[in-house]
Amino acid sequence: MEFRDLKKQYQVLREELDRAVLGAMASGAYIMGPQVRELEQQLAEYVGVKHCLTCANGTDALTLALKAWGIGPGDAVFVPDFTFFSSAEVVPLEGATPVFVDVFEETFNIDAVDLERAVKEVLAEGRLRPRVVVAVDLFGLPADYQAVRAVADRYGLLVLEDGAQGFGGSIQMADQVGHDGNVIPGASHVLAGCDRPSKRACSFGDIATTSFFPAKPLGCYGDGGAVFTDNDEWAALINSYRVHGKGTFKYDNVRIGLNSRLDTVQAAILQVKLKAFAEYELDDINAAAEKYTERLKDIVATPVIPTGFRSSWAQYTIKLKDAAQRDALQAALKAEGIPSMVYYPKPLHLQTAFADPHVGLRPPQDDKGTVRVHQDDKGRFVLPQDDSLSFRAEPQAESRNLNLCPVATSLCSRVLSLPLHPYITEEQIDTVCNAIRKVLR
């Protein structure tokens, strides 16, 4: 059994994919060929934004967004603590400081209440300028953008949507009444089965990004990424930054940029895959996820999809009682030939790369300088079992913020992702669920 069966997908799409790749190879236009621009137009139309600019990978996409906004030293960028490393990695690369924010237990996405607390702490400290919030559409589910946007607007923050895992997800948007009394539609798409317009992932941020890493909801056969925005000025800057800071032509370099282009072969592959994704893959993976939930909801904490939200299911992630139960289940699944993954085993605020107080945040310490969160003999992160830790440590002079992010820390010890993809069979789902029941019954 495959965790994400890319080989099966290729078998289904082989004829179209081979034809597209051979066409790109025969064209001789391997960099920024016509398929790249065609794909950008198709992606922009699918998402419902004015501009889509492809690039080399999802990490570069985030970097390009920060560059377009001029983010740098002295700026605070708020990032969920429970996510892939690159969501925060790009911040210190631009000289700015990541400030980690806790997430919701139910959805795994950024907690807007904790975001506001973190912004207030940064403002009270007075050393950093709050500039950006990175909202991650984790595991395919869009973040709560209504709540995130409310905080962002109150404090003048830009919203960067990290849709690396979220492409294809959506939220039904309530209609709003304008000053003239007329109804303003919440979005440009009406999805099947919805009685209200739905806004798609990668259209919620002031700038949004995605990744085309092969295992993503929409993936190529290498690396790739894209940036989405409705802002003409930012789009022009990103277009410049992605090709060495070019001006009117590629040898007119007006700023320091990157070499970050999606090649023509990958664009041709993505054109084929986007068609399949929109026509049936997104529906099929949602149907498969529903089968998992129906079979498992009485024995384990299954993913929560809020009313009006739709996930693209980059992962199907269950929650166990504790690390011991999670590890035992993973071992039992492995013994039966069933793959599973832990996304993610360590919260960002405990990553070694962010231990330098001039880079990120450090975990809370007691009066002797001892880190209050420690690892057990198996390398798992454990909270102290006493009442001396309030989960909101007092600020230390050398740190930007000492939010422990207890929910994120706990999730890292309890989450387990199961095999899921658009081509998984009901028999395979039953095999996984029966194996889980053997352990948890």
Question: Where do the language-model regions lie?
Answer:
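Hydrophobic "anchor" residues on beta-strands that sit immediately upstream
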Residues: 1, 76, 157-158
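Conserved coil-to-alpha-helix start sites within the AMP-binding
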Residues: 83-88
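PLP-dependent aminotransferase class I/II
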Residues: 36-42, 49-50, 113, 132-136, ...
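Active-site phosphate-binding strand-loop segment of PLP-dependent enzymes
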Residues: 106-220, 227-228
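Phosphate-binding glycine-rich loop
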Residues: 28-76, 90-94, 100-102
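Structural detector of well-ordered beta-strand residues that form the stable sheet scaffold
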Residues: 53, 78, 99, 159-160, ...
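N-terminal "arm"/small-domain region of PLP-dependent enzymes with the aminotransferase-like
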Residues: 1-29, 34, 419
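Short beta-strand->loop structural element characteristic of the AMP-binding/adenylate-forming
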Residues: 81, 97-107, 341
